[in-house]
């Protein structure tokens, strides 16, 4: 055999190799174990140091908690002060109305409003122009009553007053519509004298800031005259042959307000809320009585000592000394009484604010088929009252007089289609009527509007009986077929701008801020100063959009109503969470956050954070930075990320660009019980002075707008 032979490994060599590998493995395992234990010890040591540090910070926070809360309580005295000012203003406006004696009633006084209604009912033969002029006062009275119900805190509204105001509103609404019907009848009696020379029919259009009235009287009954267009408008009808040959009149009364939809229920506190406030009142009264009693006893003791030492002088001084000694006794109870009033008012305001954020557990009522859910949708642009009327007997000239037959039953509606018909093809004989309406110019629709009709029997808006709806957004025209004439309205999803994409609150001037809210369709900029709000600008689909609301200062409640009427609803209700995916935050946490953000808003800017959705419902996360008025706008400002639970505020280690959420405390920062003391750690003295000098009405208005928009839950 040739060539080298491969060396054969012996059993001893194999055993030696196995032992070496085992020793190496054990050595590596030991090194890994030692390394792991070392790292674990280091980690535990770091964790221990961190825990000790956190415990010290928590202990420090707990130690100064009472002091911080007391300071916050003093700052939050602006809320009861603002409420007291609002109460005083309500009384003052009533007094001013009383001394002006302008002839208009005070709608809050039942006797005055009832007298006004009775006297107006007695007025007859009013023309449409006269009714429209009178309607301005009536609408003003209705708005005043609605504002009383919305602006008065729930705890100040008695049940009987709510019923009284709502009944007055309904009676005024019904009477106003009745007056329009009577005035329409008077006009239609003269239709033959007002006939158009070309068509031979009567046509009249009356436009006003609150109503637009279109009336067409079919005098010629020409079967070929089936297309009706009112002059200088695109509003009109396509009527079937049977109507074109009938003694009828068509009326379109477009009220720019909605007096058809049932009144919204007034927000009232639950029994639980009432008991909380009642218990607080009892405790405060008891403590005040104890304090007053103690003060009086101390005063009497001092008085007795003074009398025993200076008995002779007292006798000589007589009554003068008695008056001097009584002064401090009278002053103390007055001061204590005021203090009790403000404490009670503070508790009432807090409870009312939490009531604003309560979420309903379910929808308020069961929906029928085709019924419009008024919790989900809202009517916009007013109501179009569509009526087919029987043409009343016409005026006839006779020997220099105008003779007219007046029907006892008044203005009668023409039934179309007839309630009973033997024709099997009734749809062909009585086809739907095509209606073309002009959409109110001051209303914004972000999607094509839906059309709803009023079901008088069921007292609800319904979507059946309407077909072939088409909308021309550029021309603001909507056309549809209607089976029978009745009031119709345009509806839009009330939550189309919810949830919000982002928001920012920043100072503009002394006691003036700008609130910017960005949604899928629009960006709204709202200015707030003192007790007023204003729409500063609006963008729709990233383009500037003009609105009649711009540059108009209004009280917060009036401003919210105006925005809703314009289709700019950014104000959730207690049922909104049933229709919108929200980032739920506990009401008590939200209220505390909004109150303290409002307190700081004169010197600090706040904005949304994407991490607010990552934390639990009892914690909120947002960004904050100092913003003094003299500063130039910063392109990329440095924001501090804060987490607030209502009881504790802390600065977070992460920022908006971090990969994951963490509640880790930012280095070299501490825990605090309030946002005020949290920002105080990094704020300038000038900023804190600006906060302390804030106007109470301004702070209250900012807080009201934050509570109404619910930025932390709906963004």
UniProtKB/Swiss-Prot annotation:
The keyword Cytoplasm applies. GO terms for cellular component: axonemal dynein complex; axoneme; cilium. Coiled coil: none annotated. Keywords: Cell projection, Cytoplasm, Ubl conjugation. It comes from the Eukaryota. Ubiquitinated. Ubiquitination leads to its degradation through the 26S proteasome. Ubiquitin-proteasome-mediated DNAI7 degradation occurs in mitosis. GO terms for molecular function: beta-tubulin binding; microtubule binding. The keyword Cytoplasm applies. Residues 291-322 are annotated as: Disordered. It holds the Pfam family Casc1_N. Residues 295-318 have a biased composition (Basic and acidic residues). Its main location: other. InterPro entries: IC97/Casc1_N, IC97/Dnai7-like. It is found in: Cell projection, Cilium; Cytoplasm. Belongs to the DNAI7 family. Via its association with the multisubunit axonemal dynein complex, is potentially involved in the regulation of cilia function. May act as a cell cycle regulator. Part of the multisubunit axonemal dynein complex formed at least of two heavy chains and a number of intermediate and light chains. Associates with tubulin. Interacts with microtubule. This is Dynein axonemal intermediate chain 7. It comes from Bos taurus (Bovine). The lineage of its organism: Eukaryota, Metazoa, Chordata, Craniata, Vertebrata. The gene is DNAI7.
